Amino acid sequence: MTEGSILGKMILFVLPMMATNLLQVAYNAADMMVVSLSHEDNAVGAIGMTGAFVNLVLNFFIGFSVGANVVIAQRIGAKEGKLASRVVHTSLILGVLVGVLGGIIGFIIAEPVLSLMGAKNNLLELATLYTRIYFAGAPFMALTNYAVAVFRAKGDAKTPLYVLSASGLINVLFNLVFVLVFGMSVDGVAWATVISNAISAIALVFCLSHSNDDCRFDFKQLRIDRRSLRDIIRIGFPAGIQSALFSFSNMMIQSSVLRVNDILAPGSVYEPVVEGNAAVSNLNGFIYTATNSVSQGSVAFTSQNVGAGKYDRVKKVMISSYAITTVVALIFSSGIFIFNHQLLSLYGIVDADGLAAIAYDSAMIKMRCETLPYFILAWMEVACGIIRGFGKSITSAIISLVGACLLRVVWLLTVFEYFLTLESIYISYPVSWLLTAAIAQVVVILELRKHNGHKTANTTVAT
């Protein structure tokens, strides 16, 4: 990462990581596609309803894995092998602890929070059931994310790909068995996800224990190092806050979608707008995951070059990241829009009459307003990733808070309240992305100028 061509190395690093992340998203996609075959009318909407809340709880705690990624990468870049090993063992302990804590909190508050978001009757029952089972596997999910962060920090994106490929197939297999053979619904796909996450967590830790570098896991060295913990929290806490704030604003989005649903389909047991929103949100998850992989790559490349003091390469990392993420976003978003009919049918959303038409139209509105301009979010993620790579995680969190979350909340309280339409909800996404991306890019430019200025000054003094 600190030598040679950046673009080529970044592509080789990002592609397997992208495939790995897409497999994790495929877990949820498989859940929703298979559960659409069950006897429950609101099953797809129930799973989609839980996304923002689940992410609010888990992303805060799992967000600390960003800190582990950055700190380990910086230690490796600085050739500090022993310190890197301490960070690895500290991060794995932290992963289990935050997973248990997040799981307990999520399990307890699931029903009241989902009810507060506007879910009721059958939708509330299904969403609560799915969420509570999902949170039972939170420790495995957290450990998986922390182990993956270790592999990525040392430049190995292939091992997580192989492990998650296998566990992903197991997840789909259990989905089909639980739903089609045993007649289960959201509970079946939730348990399938828990089982697959447990398998991936155990397998990744096993692989770490057999690695031959400073990131090797050794049970005898499993202890919390205070310095490592402090560094992880310093960078990971703001990243967790940033993820949680995004999820909070998305919860408000989900609540607003439910309000529009009640306007368009009053008194209906079936929630067509919720179903359409859930299907497209799941498809958009593939775009976000693909582009976020580029952002994570920019974090790793920036962190190692910052650790090695090679600030001139960071600008090249930025340019390469923007180029890759733009191409990836446009390919995914245009593909989803072009093949919308076929993709939506996988979730049971078809262009028919009555309530089915409302579900389909709602999905298409979301695609036009949110899916097509997703490349703007990709820019935002790269800029914020480079800022985190500099170790300025708090700065990145503040930018996201003001530019994306706060603006989106204000938008919902003003613009949406005036129009009460789906368009007035979804257009808030590209507007907030663009503002945040612009602010983040200014910060990146200032950071590069600062370090290049210091380098020039030091060279002058040495001369």
For each of these PLM feature ranges, what is it?
Residues 22, 26-44, 114-121, 177-184, ...:
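Helix-terminus/linker motif at the lipid-water interface of multi-pass membrane proteins
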Residues 41-52, 127, 131, 190, ...:
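Small-residue hotspots at the loop-to-helix junctions and early N-terminal turns
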Residues 1-14, 72-139, 170, 181-237, ...:
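Short alpha-helical transmembrane segments in multi-pass integral membrane proteins
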Residues 3, 7-26, 30, 53-60, ...:
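Residue-level signal for short hydrophobic patches within transmembrane helices
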Residues 17, 21, 33, 70, ...:
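Transmembrane alpha-helix boundary and packing residues in multipass membrane permease domains
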Residues 65, 134-152, 160-171, 189-204, ...:
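Short runs within selected transmembrane alpha-helices of multi-pass transporters and secretion channels
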Residues 12-31, 133, 167, 196-200, ...:
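Transmembrane helical elements of multi-pass membrane transporters/channels
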Residues 44-104, 141-160, 254, 274-340, ...:
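Small-residue-rich hydrophobic transmembrane alpha-helices
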